[in-house]
Amino acid sequence: MQKKNKPINSYESKHSSKREKDLFYSLCDKNHDVIKTENFKQTLLKSGLKKNDNRLYSLFQMLDTFGKEIYYDDFIKIISSAGLLVEKALRGELALPDFSDFSKNVDEMFKEVAKNKSGELASYIPPLAKVDPDQFGISIVTVDGQVYQRGDFNEDFSIQSMCKPFNYCFALEELGLDEVHKHVGQEPSGRKFNDLTLLVRSSEGFQNNSTNIPFNPMINAGAIMTTGLINSDETYEKRFNFIKNEFAKLIGWTAKGKFDSKFPRFNKDVAREENFTGYHNMAIGYLLMETGNLPDKENNHKKKVNQKHDNFDFYNEPSVTEALKLYFSVCSLEMTATEVAMAAATLANNGVCPVTQDRVLNQKTVRDCLPILQSSGMYDASGAFFQQVGLPAKSGVGGGVFLVIPQLMGICIFSPRLDKQGNSVRGIEMAKQITSKYLVHMFDGAMTNADRIDPRIPISRWRANSCGEAIWAASNGDI
């Protein structure tokens, strides 16, 4: 039954505070001590939070029981049960305090970048050569779980090399930094992602050679190595299931509301085609085995002897074939831009998934991963990309690019047309547009620029700061 409108003072108790009262009044209809339930919902949604967010799931169910209006005592119950997230959203104190303004700006960037039709599909993997080249989507997830989506954000696409930093993280979690880097280096290669050249360690430092360890975990050789390190004593099935389950945690699939996430999908056709055409990767696999750095799986096949005098059993090294099979399988997982953005936001949030609040990765693992991502994540264009965009990022030939803005957000752009380095053309352009509009480059620091916005502060405060700085400069003759 709907409650009668009572004077707000009659509800004051030890459970209420001036802060809560001020917040209630700020949401009330003019001249009424009541909040419209629909307005309350819309305020939360306009802040960038989603109705199917695990943390708001119970709240929205509760709101449906209040009818059309919320009175002060019910408001106190809501605030008490919903936790800090709702209060921050209502006060405009989430990671992006002006989510609407941010969304409008990214909308404009999206429209502009959509005009770019340059680039080619990844023709060397047949299923990827058949995708719609005009697909274009973006999703942005903040560390507070705010979500921006535009275009084909809900289309499945092959993550390909975007899996590499996460596989590296899984290996770090299992073995630790020192052990992993006995098998793979930390240096930018400056070479194509599938180059066969490895890195040699000697007393005189590092030098190029055809043997020893891969340069870093973000090129194919390094990714095959780190994938081979994950649960190396287990069967392929157990290892692949483990990796899929870890990705599910990263993208928030375990949340009650499922947050627009599905369990990672395996595209067997893509994996098979990579197997049929991946001779270069097979060569890398055997090269890694020859160096002695790929974990050796025990098997009795070597002991078998073909009894025919003019025949023998040709031996394929199972350590290589299984590492490659697992690597091809993980590259062939499909996700949406929103799911990948959630995984990127988990990295931005020091390993804690924004919507489940579960710690998926140790903070040290994330800290160790992001520098490698920054120096080597965009193939042989990594240096130029970081100079221009200034953010850790990873691309894949399926058309995806994700970016990590530490302590703020994860971004994923999907557009399958690629440049000569194998990076999404629109993905790179969109990343450049975002960092040209917003002060998110890692080396912006305290830099001020009247044309660039700090997304972490309310737009009104940013404008006031810019105006104040202009007045101060003018008063000192610096105009």
Where do the model's predicted regions map?
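Structured C-terminal helix/loop/strand segments within mature extracytoplasmic catalytic/sensor domains
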Residues: 7-15, 21, 31, 40, ...
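Primarily EF-hand calcium-binding motifs
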Residues: 11-34, 51-69
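Amphipathic regulatory helices of Ca2+-sensor modules
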Residues: 34-51, 71-83
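EF-hand and EF-hand-like Ca2+-sensor regions
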Residues: 63-94
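Active-site-adjacent helix/loop patches that line small-molecule binding or acyl-intermediate pockets
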Residues: 89-108, 118, 171-299, 310-330, ...
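A short, well-structured edge-of-sheet supersecondary motif
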Residues: 111-150, 402-403
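Active-site SXXK
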Residues: 145, 158-178, 343, 411
